[in-house]
Amino acid sequence: MKITSRKVVVIGTGFVGTSIAYSMINQGLVNELVLIDVNQDKAEGEALDLLDGVSWGQENVIVRAGDYKDCKNADIVVVTAGVNQKPGQSRLDLVNTNAKIMRSIVTQVMDSGFDGIFVIASNPVDILTYVAWETSGLDQSRIVGTGTTLDTTRFRKELATKLEIDPRSVHGYIIGEHGDSEVAVWSHTTVGGKPILEFIVKNKKIGVEDLSNLSNKVKNAAYEIIDKKQATYYGIGMSTARIVKAILNNEQAILPVSAYLRGEYGQEGVFTGVPSIVNQNGVREIIELNIDAYEKKQFEKSVSQLKEVIESIK
């Protein structure tokens, strides 16, 4: 699929949708940005507010409220709509209500004649990416969930902070569910190209026992933020904009998005967070890491849990 107009439609103008829109405008990613919401006044107000800052951005951009007919010639439709996670709720607690919302949205998008790429940011993202694919009839590669992109950047940031290293020099992934069963891939985590276990032997800033605590902190990061401010949106806003950028610029970038497994990691028939090559066609290829036995077992548990939830909503 060739990117033509750099037109992106964002469905849902809550905290997440507007954070994604704001991030895309600031980075000069789009030529046209259309906001859709069940509350038309909200969409119009957000568009007007964003327009007030366009002249300070990197590129001139059209920003407006619209409707589903605007999806027809869009390159990307980003879906953020759904009920929000409340304090004490897991992301999977949201599944029944948000699955119904996702089916309704995707049906209306496809009825417009849309032939682009979906980026799904609604939670639980792995399940709703599956629902979007099943409803759309598009190839799995064209449905891209945000997956563990945010978890991975949290992981790198936390480890970098402990080691007093620039996060851009720390490489590693969180895979599996964007949620409580996510898996930190320590076996492929490196600092300046050096495996983490080798690095900490000489670094002395953290020990092996600290690694488990760190991955748990990453897993629970959203709960801490929700307890303090009721919602998370800036981090996922910037993470989603990064995925959009990779698609629009045909980057061939490796990002841990929610992608459809066809035997990779010994699993199939589910969308979940795995390192994937992302380009103008969506997910070009999944990168299959040679994870260790413990990580493989945890990943299998994560995928199994997702499959159970998918079966429950069919």
Swiss-Prot record:
Keyword terms, alphabetized: Allosteric enzyme, Cytoplasm, NAD, Oxidoreductase, Phosphoprotein
Cellular component, GO, one term: cytoplasm
Intracellular or extracellular location(s): Cytoplasm
Highest rank taxon of the organism: Bacteria
Alphabetized CDD domains for the sequence: HicDH_like
Regulation: Allosterically activated by fructose 1,6-bisphosphate (FBP).
Top EC class, one word: oxidoreductase
EC number from the UniProt entry: 1.1.1.27
Annotated pathway: Fermentation; pyruvate fermentation to lactate; (S)-lactate from pyruvate: step 1/1
GO biological process: glycolytic process; lactate metabolic process
Family matches, as InterPro entries: L-lactate/malate_DH, L-lactate_DH, L-lactate_DH_AS, Lactate/malate_DH_C, Lactate/malate_DH_N, Lactate_DH/Glyco_Ohase_4_C, NAD(P)-bd_dom_sf
Active site, renumbered: H178 (proton acceptor)
Annotated substrate binding sites: Q85, R91, N123, P124, V125, D126, D151, T152, T153, R154, T232
Assembly mode: Homotetramer.
PANTHER family, A to Z: L-2-HYDROXYCARBOXYLATE DEHYDROGENASE (NAD(P)(+)), L-LACTATE DEHYDROGENASE
Protein name as annotated: L-lactate dehydrogenase 2
Lineage: Bacteria, Bacillati, Bacillota, Bacilli, Lactobacillales
Gene: ldh2
